[in-house]
Amino acid sequence: MSQQLTREEQERKYPNETWDLTTIFESDEAFEKALKEVESYLGKEEQFKGHLGDSAKTLYNALALEDEIGTQLEKVYVYAHLKQDQDTSNDKYTGFESRAHQLIIKISSAWSFLVPEILQIDEEKLESFIKSNDDLKRYAFDLKLINEKRPHILDADKEKLLT
């Protein structure tokens, strides 16, 4: 029976069978920096609460910010998750995954007002927002899907409780 290789031994013996995560982040330090950057977005959603129906521009700015945060958060989480999967015995990478997961929960909770508040906008007004703002047209399909959920979405407080 052969002896099981350690993670380092396996990486040395089979370098082509190891994920190259430098395409996501060059280093763990770059990951840490990106994680902090995403954390710095917490609280920026407050400027949009209660104002999504004010104008097409406000709605677009909220959706664009939430989209940007989501993109960065996904990158952070994928790196952390794959690092943990590389070596589940490494506490450092288990911590990375845990911190990234906790950040997902915080961001999701912070933005939980978004869909219920969009649904508070009258359907005709929402349609006029989309028609009047070329940037917002990028989110037309998403807004259509949200609108189809009108009968099934709770108010903002109840949605936050569920997240």
What do these predicted ranges mean?
Residues 1-163:
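A well-structured
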